[in-house]
Amino acid sequence: MVVATMLGGMWVASRYLRAGLAGDAAIERAAVPPAQLALALLGTVLVVSGANALNMYIERDTDLLMERTRSRPLPARRLSPELALWFGIALSAASIPVLLVGVNATTGVLAAAALLSYVLVYTPLKRRTTLSLPIGAIPGAIPPLLGWTSVTGQIDAPGFLLFAVMFLWQIPHFLAISLFRQDEYQRAGLKVLPLEKGDLTTRRHIVGYLALLVLSSVLFVPLGVAGPVYLGAAILLGGAFFGLGVYGLRAGTGARWARQVFFASMVYLVLLFAALMIGA
């Protein structure tokens, strides 16, 4: 999913640049070499894989206490912790030079910031505060921005909007998980909103972030990134997703609703990015 959003950002950026240029010669001069795009994809895969490997190394004891993570290689003892650590370090160390040298400085710096904040800030904070979720959503939202900057070389309004949509999407997605798996989080000693503030507050947060997500998603149109086809899709998808969120404010909806939000969030993201790529 992470790499797919990066590719989506890359595709939309390419279409956006071409739409703003007049004449075949200008388009040809602005075209990004295929080798550079391939290196951008490679670097993104490396940095995401490296960050995940290091995260799993740090959380190997916690993962053993949770059903959703206990089958991972480290808690399941299919891989030694030392090997996982060096594997994560090697991937991470290789990723940044690939992006800095092979793509551009902006993409390399963003990837380094995402890697360091994910491993050194977000991961330790999960045991200390519920704010780890919005903090962790920052590096989690960078991949589509990496796709954008790998083509444009800069962070501008459309690129930041890609980041914002991905950031806002993650909050209800992971809050839904914390609702129907809160017993596992409690057993693992992780700080999540349902355990700290209760289910109703968590549901209200989900609805609030869904409202911001839907509003942000339509801003691609006034920015000139997408047209009416995308706008229609964004309104329909957003309306359905938001409606599901509001339904969860009713008493008695329970864990089943939270699971529905979780699965709906994945469908929503895939379809929204598909509509954006088609409508760009």
Curated annotation (Swiss-Prot):
Presence of the UniProt keyword Repeat in the record: no
A GO molecular-function annotation: protoheme IX farnesyltransferase activity
One Pfam family cited in the UniProt record for this chain: UbiA
Bilayer topology: Multi-pass membrane protein
Spans traversing the lipid bilayer: 2-21, 30-50, 83-103, 105-125, 131-151, 160-180, 206-226, 229-249, 260-280
CDD domains xrefs: PT_UbiA_Cox10 (cd13957)
Keywords from the UniProt entry: Cell inner membrane, Cell membrane, Heme biosynthesis, Membrane, Transferase, Transmembrane, Transmembrane helix
EC numbers, comma separated: 2.5.1.141
Involved pathway(s): Porphyrin-containing compound metabolism; heme O biosynthesis; heme O from protoheme: step 1/1
UniProt-annotated location(s): Cell inner membrane
Gene Ontology terms: cellular component: plasma membrane
Single GO BP term: heme O biosynthetic process
Catalytic activity: heme b + (2E,6E)-farnesyl diphosphate + H2O = Fe(II)-heme o + diphosphate
Job of this protein: Converts heme B (protoheme IX) to heme O by substitution of the vinyl group on carbon 2 of heme B porphyrin ring with a hydroxyethyl farnesyl side group.
Family of the protein in this entry: Belongs to the UbiA prenyltransferase family. Protoheme IX farnesyltransferase subfamily.
Other observations noted: Carbon 2 of the heme B porphyrin ring is defined according to the Fischer nomenclature.
Descriptive protein name: Protoheme IX farnesyltransferase
